[in-house]
C-alpha cells in the first residue's frame, strides 16, 4: 500500500476544488487576494483555504488519523477583480464542524487568525462571510432588537436622535450630567458617553453614572418621553465591565454601551447576555474598526465586523454616515446597513454583498449615523437611513450658538419636519434645505 509520504506539496492539490458544490451548512468566505508576483491564483486561494482550516506547511503523519476531506476548507471559485492588476476574489467553503457554537471569537480566530500574514500573499481582505442558519442559530444575537426597543421606548415612525457629550474628556461628572440633561430636555432621545470615556481621574465611572441617572429622570419627568444615555461599561477586565453594567441597571438606566472591537467579542457577548436577561439595551461603538477595514486590499471589510456584531449581540451599532466627516460610500454602506437590520438580504455585488444572507429571525440592529453630521444633513440622513436608525449629532448639537438645549431642539424640529415632508411625498433630496428653512422659522 501507499505509505506516508513526507515533504512539502502544493496546497492546490488538496485545497483547490472548483468542482465542489457548497453545502447549506458551510460557512462561506469571500477573500480579496493579492498574490505575490509569480504565485498562481489557484495556489494562493488554496493556501488561504488551507491555512484557515486544517492545513499546515508540510504533510504531517497525523493527517492520517483524521478525515481531511470532512474537515478541510476548500477554495471552490476564483475570479479576477475587474480593473485591478493581479487581484482576485477567492471563495472558500468551511465545514460547520470547524467552529465552536456561539463563539464569534472562535469564528474569527479560524477564518482570519493566521492566514493574513501569509508569505505567498501580498495582501488579503475578508470581504464577506455567509453565515448559515445552522450556525447563526447557535447565537442569541442582539439583546432586544429594533422592534422590542421601539416598544420599550414607545417611539415609532421616525429615526431616533442622539448626541455624544463633548468635550469628550475633561468634564467633571456634575457638568457632564448637566450637558446630558440639557440635550434630553431639548428633545433628543439619547445622549452618549464618548467611546474613550471609561473611568479616568477627572471623572470616575460611578460619579458619572449617578449624575447621568439624575439627568435622565429629571428630563423624563419634564418631557413625558422615555430618555436614555449610553453609559459606557467598557473596562479593563470583564469583571469590571459587568460591575458597571449591573450598577447601571440598579440605577434604572435603560441602556449601556460597549466598545466591541477594543473590548473584544468575548466580553461583548457576555455583556449582551447580561443585557438580554436584565432588560438593558446595548449600544455598540466600533472604535478601532478603521485599523481593520480602512485599506481596500488588506484587512476585513466592515460588513464582516457588522455581521460578527449582530451574532455577538448589540442593539445599536455605529455604521458610518455617508455624508459626515468620515469615509463611507453610499451603496456599500446601505448594503451593510441592510445586513444589520433585515431578515433576508439578497446577494448584490454592486452593494458589496457577496452572498445571500438569511438571518432567519435573529433580531436586527439599529445602524447609528454619527460623526460630523449636523442639522443641514437631516434631509439626506432621513432619506438614506429611513426610520430604523439612530442619528447622532455631537458637535451638531452642542455647537449651537445658543447652547445645548436649543441645539437639541433644532435637531428634533428638523427631524420631525423631514419625516413629515417625506410622509407628505415631498422630495427630500431636492427640497431638503427649504424644508429645514421653513421649519426653523
UniProtKB/Swiss-Prot annotation:
Binds 1 Mg(2+) ion per subunit. It comes from Pellaea rotundifolia (Button fern). The keyword Chloroplast applies. GO terms for molecular function: magnesium ion binding; monooxygenase activity; ribulose-bisphosphate carboxylase activity. The modification N6,N6,N6-trimethyllysine is found at residue 5. Substrate binds at residues 114, 164, 168, 286, 318, 370. It is found in: Plastid, Chloroplast. This is Ribulose bisphosphate carboxylase large chain. NCBIfam families: PRK04208.1 (NF003252).
